[in-house]
Amino acid sequence: RIVIGASLTELKNIKTDPKVDYIFKDNESGASRGLLCALDIYNKITKFDLTKGDIISGTGSIDDKGVVGSIDGVKYKLAGAVKRHAKVFIVPTDNYKEALYEKEKHNYDIEIIEADTLHNVIEKLKAR
């Protein structure tokens, strides 16, 4: 039996000033990493370090207006973040209650940040 898989991805070439080269690792794919990619790019083009030296993990799709969308598998992604000693886990608004439930259920020592828009997440990270 032969099985063939295909993945379709919409590519966009966006010109920025300053220029940003962004390389994706082979094991990184899917819409659920969109928010973290956007935050990483923001961190590269500004002088303010959003991480403040901490490990920040998270998930969430993002549209071209900066609105963060829900994802699947929050409990697994949160558990992975805790395992990697992340201090912060960013999660879409639609998944926020589930993340809080999992944090309490497993007594995770991690800050959960609710993500509705890219702008608001940036402001929350700056304020922490």
PLM feature spans:
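C-terminal recognition in membrane/secretory proteostasis and scaffolding
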Residues: 1-58, 63-75, 79-128
